[in-house]
Amino acid sequence: MLKLSGEGLRDSYHSRRDQIALKNLQSDVTEAKSDFTKETLASQNTKMISSIVISQMIDENKSRENRASLPLPCAIAQSRAHHAKQSLANRSGVNIHRAFALLPGRLGIPAPSDERGPEAELPPKEERPCGGPRRGFASITITARRVGPPARALVWGTAGDSLCPKCRAEDTLFQAPPALANGAHPGRHQRSFACTEFSRNSSVVRLKVPEAHTGLCERRKYWVTHADDKETSFSPDTPLSGKSPLVFSSCVHLRVSQQCPDSIYYVDKSLSVPIEPPQIASPKMHRSVLSLNLNCSSHRLTADGVDGLVNREPISEALKQELLEGDQDLVGQRWNPGLQESHLKETPSLRRVHLGTGACPWSGSFPLENTELANVGANQVTVRKGEKDHTTHCHASDHANQLSIHIPGWSYRAVHTKVFSGSSKRQQGEVCMTVSAPPVEQKPTRHFLPIGDSSPSDDCLSRDLSEPTERRHQSFLKPRILFPGFLCPLQDVCASLQEDNGVQIESKFPKGDYTCCDLVVKIKECKKSEDPTTPEPSPAAPSPAPRDGAGSPGLSEDCSESQQTPARSLTLQEALEVRKPQFISRSQERLKKLEHMVQQRKAQRKEDLRQKQSLLPIRTSKKQFTIPHPLSDNLFKPKERCISEKEMHMRSKRIYDNLPEVKKKKEEQRKRVILQSNRLRAEVFKKQLLDQLLQRNAV
């Protein structure tokens, strides 16, 4: 799960009342019913997502009010949209069961799976703001699960153009080619998508889930990603070999509210693909691409320089899009996903994340990515990626806007930030980050270099055009390279994907009159050759700060549980040998030095002992005295001296006085002296007393 959070992003033109509208769009049916039946029989072994559960969390205190304030036209449009899809389902024979299940307790909208009605077309424009307190989404959770088809499940149509003009303009990447629409081969590429739209205070949240159905035709795989680009499609007329890549594509469109400054959005999107036994004995390479396009729009100034609150309309309506170079007409196009995920069958998943915001924060322009893959051998797939980012100037608020992307299990590798100052009212910066999980082997990342004055030392570069009031444009080169970055979500690191730790990508807008920023995330390249395994699902999520986002799905949980095998992790010694051989060599040199020092000390001690043993017999024979121990405190050397006669008498007297007989004799003598003195004192006292008595008698 990929979590994105935005802070400090508010919009002043939103209404006061909370409105929720559900709009479901469905494409037209352009193929014959027999072709659908063949495709259904060919894809019986393919495990696909059978239902999408969308839940939007709203404050409990306002849930009843939102349920009561739901406009009648929205409910009618919702019912008509589902009636249209039901009628399309009755016209087609595709056995793909899908149902939208919303939480009625939360949204106050009944589940549309059992409704029926005439076919209708939804208007693409957004709802006007209504009165009510201004509040943003607390959280939006989008989940995809594999469940059994219900008794009255909707049968969705496939291929062709969308009923909604928005989706027709936005879904250019997943158009089915004309070569497959003629029904010449039963194992062709089929497409079905679901588009829901929630309108709340002029802020729309949309989810589009297109999926590529892969059929089997004489054990050959056919892959189509773009109708307009001939290099991205493999026609059944030219069958591919067993080494060709098999691609499954899916995307999620999400436009979030700008009201809540501290909002967190969770997107959990899974893609189920068929897993077959390996056709060859040798292991293969498995690669997948995860692309994130985050677009921001300003909520302060419009194209004419007036605040959006004055015009009472979002800036996306006022700003028109245009490209410097390209062959597609983007007028009226509101979003182009630019998302593609490729899987080489029966191998572990390797993922690359390329996240770019070529537009200003909260502007009305969006990036366009065209990913083209070509077969270059057994296990080599090349990508030619071109980005045409068109940006507009926007007013930067005084407080620092912050965009944080949390991807569990990923960690920082490198951060490069470069801000360029152009005119007095414009600044443009670009942040390039390298993110990676614990793969088995990593290689240096090769980055895309933009057109213009680019230096080889910079990972990314921003251009500032000279026009002070017109929109600026960016155009990236389209080099043919081997996937610039990969990520290996192997089973040994799947536990870390469930933890809360992750990658945080923060882009703080510099202060100035107008600010534009580009945010690019690239993942280091990783290659792993092993037995076929099925990766865990690796969903991605758009952030609340940008206007639109795209997330790439992973495989379903049931496939991963039944097919995935544990991958052996590298030990510490093997990892050091691969990544830091110098560390091992230096450690070995230090150990050798320590051993040499120990041997030298032992030899020195032996020499000292030999010298002492040779000197001891000479000293003992010559002089008789004690030799002090070298480690003792008594390190002085005793000297030979002669004792005088007086000293000898004094010593003898001390010895004599300390004898017990002598001590006793001295004690008796002392007592006799005391007794004699006491007797003398008694006699003197008697004499004095007698004299006094005689004198008194005389008187």
Curated annotation (Swiss-Prot):
Residues 571-699 are annotated as: ALMS motif. Residues 107-134, 443-473, 528-569 are annotated as: Disordered. One of its GO terms (biological process) is protein polyubiquitination. One of its GO terms (molecular function) is ubiquitin protein ligase activity. Its EC number is 2.3.2.-. Residues 113-129, 460-473 have a biased composition (Basic and acidic residues). It is found in: Cytoplasm; Cytoplasm, Cytoskeleton, Microtubule organizing center, Centrosome. InterPro entries: ALMS_motif, C10orf90_N. Residues 116-224 are annotated as: Required for interaction with HDAC1. One of its GO terms (cellular component) is nucleoplasm. Keywords: Cytoplasm, Cytoskeleton, Transferase, Tumor suppressor, Ubl conjugation pathway. Residues 534-545 have a biased composition (Pro residues). Residues 48-116 are annotated as: Required for interaction with p53/TP53. Pfam families: ALMS_motif, Centro_C10orf90. It comes from the Eukaryota. Its main location: cytoplasm. PANTHER family: (E2-INDEPENDENT) E3 UBIQUITIN-CONJUGATING ENZYME FATS, ALMS1-RELATED. Tumor suppressor that is required to sustain G2/M checkpoint after DNA damage. Acts as a p53/TP53 activator by inhibiting MDM2 binding to p53/TP53 and stimulating non-proteolytic polyubiquitination of p53/TP53. Exhibits ubiquitin ligase (E3) activity and assemble ubiquitin polymers through 'Lys-11'- (K11-), 'Lys-29'- (K29-) and 'Lys-63'- (K63)-linkages, independently of the ubiquitin-conjugating enzyme (E2). Promotes p53/TP53-dependent transcription of CDKN1A/p21, leading to robust checkpoint response. Mediates CDKN1A/p21 protein stability in a ubiquitin-independent manner. Interacts with HDAC1; the interaction prevents binding of HDAC1 to CDKN1A/p21 and facilitates the acetylation and stabilization of CDKN1A/p21. Interacts with p53/TP53; the interaction inhibits binding of p53/TP53 and MDM2. This is (E2-independent) E3 ubiquitin-conjugating enzyme FATS. It comes from Homo sapiens. The lineage of its organism: Eukaryota, Metazoa, Chordata, Craniata, Vertebrata.
